Amino acid sequence: LLQDRTGYIWCGTSDGLNRFDSRHFKTFRHIPGDTASLGNNVIHSLFEDSKGNLWIGTENGVFRYRVSEEKFSTFHLPDIPDRLSQKIIYSIKEDQLGKIWISVYGSGVFRYNPSDGKIKHYSHDINDEKSLISNLTTKILIDHTGDIWIATHDQGVCKYDPFTDSFFRIDATDKQRGYTARYIYALCEDSFGNIWLCDNGLFKYDKTTRNCTACLPPADEPITYIHFITEIQPGILLIGSNSGLTQYNLAEN
């Protein structure tokens, strides 16, 4: 879900993109032969950039919707082998410099600079410990300080170092319990600057102490496969998972 600057609510589904104007829905779907239509009907991510363009991440690539023209266009990503019939886009974000970061599951991360049109591809290199930790990238988080966090489906999370144009791994292990966040499906930052990592459980990463704590739900209220997390007010997290919708009060733990 996304609410844009004009008030429209956009809803990505497995059967197209819906726009709600508070009274009516309008549905956008792929139309064979129409290059100005949405290129794929399975939506995984939505993002509005600082210029008001809507970015749509789908099961097979990225598309942009120009509101003024009411047209979709394909955003071409380089370096992705043609044999990859599916280019799943789980996350699209804009950093403080106006550059667009795109997570492509299986291919790593792409950074697009609108000012010159250049695209840089970041991928895992087994011989380079400062490369992206995995190509199975899922979510991207840009926190209030501008730090860029990249979550992966098998190697946990890493941060981008803009000074060296490289990445370093975050130790997301609760050392007391021995649990490690490795299969990250969702990320968010709370009002206190903590980073929340979600896989089959919930982990809090303290940026100041660099400690990671596993926050376990009650045994009778299990939370499995968390796909979404956000802070709806200071100290209150809303978590979407296969178990339903859960509200987590940080003060009461």
Predicted features along the sequence, with ranges:
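Carboxylate-rich, polar loop motifs that coordinate divalent cations or form catalytic acidic clusters
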Residues: 1-253
